[in-house]
């Protein structure tokens, strides 16, 4: 089943030994094609870096002592929550906290609930048990936990059912769900996580419901060429979303970071991603999304591969 397979990969694959050996940080200097078998493009980490972390279903960060945040994704339907204990043990062994993204749907292929029905169900209490189960399981974990619910809500590009709700509906649903979760998990931090697009402010649920704000930042060289006619930088891609949320006065993180392009493009992003920038004084963490993109990007550029290391047999 897709949901159980994906969650198992997220939670347990890190315990496996990766088929290749990669540097803990940095980018190889080989001048080769953009997907060299031995290339590692993970962000470069120094003593001054913003706290790094990763969503790592391919186990490339298993032995990376720099990574301090283990990012997990799970649906709130059709999921084996017992596997969270394995993720907790894995994170504690590596002295990492847990960032848990909870998506209000199922990953089953036959899941068919429209936006309005999902919203009505949440507000009507039909999914209270789902969130209670997730948060009750998370309350048993020993690692520090941050809960991120229904991300990128302001970007209705067709990827997420909840992104078709209007701002009022989203805010009401978010507050309802966080109230439920806090009954079981009062010690958690709660992350509100827009993509960073224009209009996101209308979806802000209020200071009482937000401990930290998470953004999504991606750089894809083929898309850059079509959209702006040149390569974009990490700062350039991050600044619009950061500027839109900084007025809320909350700590800010990049909950999902990815970049893909030729060696020069990847090197530039790797060097800048976790560096402290004067433009982003409230940035507290940058968490890499170490997987392929799930959906094709616009302009017929396909599905970017954000993975930091090549997996030639995939």
Where do the model's predicted regions map?
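Distinct, well-ordered alpha-helical segments
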Residues: 196-209, 266-267
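N-terminal substrate-binding region of glycoside hydrolase catalytic domains
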Residues: 29-129, 259-262, 287-288
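Substrate-binding cleft of extracellular glycoside hydrolase catalytic domains
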Residues: 81, 86-189, 289
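Bacterial N-terminal signal peptides
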Residues: 10-19
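Glycoside hydrolase catalytic-domain groove-lining segments
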Residues: 85-103, 205-208, 212-262
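Substrate-binding cleft of secreted/luminal carbohydrate-active enzymes
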Residues: 36, 43, 253-314
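Acidic (Asp/Glu)-rich catalytic clusters
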Residues: 58-65, 82-100, 134-142, 204-208, ...
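Aromatic-lined carbohydrate-recognition surfaces of secreted/lumenal glycan-active proteins
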Residues: 174, 178-200, 251-262, 288
């Amino acid at each position: 089943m897709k949901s159980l397979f994906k969650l198992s990969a997220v939670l347990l694959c890190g315990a496996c030994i990766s088929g290749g050996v990669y540097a803990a940080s940095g980018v190889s200097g080989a001048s080769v094609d953009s997907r060299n078998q031995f290339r590692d493009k993970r962000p470069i980490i120094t003593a001054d870096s913003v706290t790094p972390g990763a969503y790592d279903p391919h186990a490339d960060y298993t032995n990376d002592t720099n990574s301090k945040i283990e990012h997990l994704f799970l649906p709130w339907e059709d999921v084996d929550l017992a596997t969270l204990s394995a993720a907790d043990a894995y994170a504690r062994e590596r002295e990492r906290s847990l960032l848990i993204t909870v998506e209000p749907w199922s990953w089953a292929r036959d899941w068919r609930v429209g936006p309005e029905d999902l919203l009505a169900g949440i507000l009507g209490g039909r999914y209270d048990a789902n969130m209670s189960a997730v948060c009750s399981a998370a309350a048993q974990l020993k690692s520090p936990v941050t809960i991120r619910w229904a991300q990128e809500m302001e970007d209705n590009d067709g990827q997420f059912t909840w992104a078709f709700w209007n701002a009022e509906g989203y805010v009401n649903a978010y507050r309802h769900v966080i109230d439920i979760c806090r009954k079981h998990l009062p010690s958690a931090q709660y992350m509100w996580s827009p993509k960073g697009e224009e209009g996101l402010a209308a979806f802000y649920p209020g200071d009482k419901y937000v401990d930290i704000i998470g953004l999504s930042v991606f750089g894809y060289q083929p898309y850059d060429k079509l959209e702006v006619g040149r390569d974009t930088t990490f700062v350039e891609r991050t600044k619009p979303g950061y500027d839109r949320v900084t007025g809320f006065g909350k700590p800010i993180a990049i909950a999902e970071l990815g970049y893909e392009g030729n060696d020069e493009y990847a090197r530039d992003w790797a060097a800048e991603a976790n560096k402290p920038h004067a433009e982003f004084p409230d940035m507290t963490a940058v968490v890499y999304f170490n997987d392929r993109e799930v959906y094709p990007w616009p302009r017929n550029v396909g599905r970017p591969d954000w993975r930091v290391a090549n997996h030639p047999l995939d």
